[in-house]
Amino acid sequence: MIDGLKLGALAAVCVALATGGAAAQQVDSSYTNVDLDECTVIEADDFGARWACPGLKGIPVMIAEGDLRFFVSYGLKSTEEKAAAQTLPPFNHLGPRIEWRVSNAEGHWKPFATILRFFTQREEGEEENQILVVTKVQEGATCHVAYIDALANPDANELARQAADEAAPDFDCANEPEFVGAFEAWDIE
């Protein structure tokens, strides 16, 4: 026979497991393509260009290129966000897809972070590096949160999702992005 104390503890464990599973289902991924041919050219000159591209759930994507480096920001005021001025040190170009991390915590799916693969130049003749850039997406606080070296970490995609889910919501854009996992793409010292 189970006494009241044991029954109460069993009920608490069941509730914790049930709500833990529900909480885990509160975050998911959606994907959009990065195709500059599908974007609107905002400005272009000999030094670079800026495009407005379709995003997810009405959140536009601003992509800029200058000095052989790409900059990506999100939102209606994307050019005013810190992300609009953030890129990686080596010459780089973008991967073909944006992974949007979306939360249903407010009862509807809302993007709160993105993961975008940047390909960065190595020494001549070497394979390009691949860096996953995690960006917080929040009006007035859109910025790089974390960098993951996709070639140095076999679980790089999972590390990026974990950084997006755990660090992005409360990340202070006054801070520098974090390097997550092993990092060999360039000297970070």
Predicted features and spans:
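Charge-rich, low-complexity N-terminal segments
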Residues: 2-7, 20-85
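Bacterial N-terminal signal peptides
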Residues: 8-18
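Intrinsically disordered and other compositionally biased segments
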Residues: 10, 23, 106-108
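Flexible, glycine- and charge-enriched loops at secondary-structure boundaries
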Residues: 58, 84-88, 153, 157
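Short helix/strand-capping turn motifs
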Residues: 88-154
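C-terminal partner/receptor-binding element of secreted or periplasmic proteins
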Residues: 149-189
